[in-house]
Amino acid sequence: MENLQVNQREKKTRHSSRQCRRKGLVPGVIYGKGINNFLFEIGELELNHALSVTGEHGLLSINSQEGSLNTLIKEVQRDPVTRRVLHIDLEKVEGNEEIETAVPINYVGEEYINKLDAVLQKNLDSIKVKCSPSNIPKGVNLNVGRAKPGDQFKIADVEFGNEITVVDDLNSIVASVSYDQKIITQEVVDQEVAENRAKKES
């Protein structure tokens, strides 16, 4: 678990958030059972490093003037263009009590699908699970390397450890494989050109 030092933030306004970011800081909030919402700011570089280690659904140990808390990352808001972190929401966790969180899906072998002139259509980028904080995985792998057009993958096809309970419907479609529409369209155009040429020659 990554340890981060944060400073309390007094105001929650759009202006104060912009000021915070101009200083190279990211505004955030901690909430949970038995505590009042705690507004804070943290260095952008330190936060980016922590997210690269834990992922965007992992655990963070937060140290502040109020003491230390173990927290779960609930939401990371990013700028849609620059991808810089704009805000982060954290939830206090108690000991090893089970919690629900979303775990990212890592699609393994997608490059082999592309070699088949096919595309992988991803319906989900994460799966909701329930487990103790210490057992939260950084991500789960779904091997799609042997897939062919027409194949579908369900949540049930993803492997989880026995210590993890899947909250989402196991029959939900995670991804499917289909032919590349651009290639199909080009083939149709080529065929029509060939047919028109044959008609003119006849």
UniProtKB/Swiss-Prot annotation:
Keywords: Ribonucleoprotein, Ribosomal protein, RNA-binding, rRNA-binding. SUPFAM superfamilies: Ribosomal protein L25-like. One of its GO terms (cellular component) is cytosolic large ribosomal subunit. GO terms for biological process: translation. InterPro entries: Rbsml_bL25/Gln-tRNA_synth_N, Ribosomal_bL25/Gln-tRNA_synth, Ribosomal_bL25_b-dom, Ribosomal_bL25_C, Ribosomal_bL25_long, Ribosomal_L25_dom, Ribosomal_uL5_bac-type. GO terms for molecular function: 5S rRNA binding; structural constituent of ribosome. Disulfide bonds: none annotated. Pfam families: Ribosomal_L25p (PF01386), Ribosomal_TL5_C (PF14693). It comes from the Bacteria. Part of the 50S ribosomal subunit; part of the 5S rRNA/L5/L18/L25 subcomplex. Contacts the 5S rRNA. Binds to the 5S rRNA independently of L5 and L18. Belongs to the bacterial ribosomal protein bL25 family. CTC subfamily. NCBIfam families: bL25_bact_ctc. This is one of the proteins that binds to the 5S RNA in the ribosome where it forms part of the central protuberance. This is Large ribosomal subunit protein bL25.
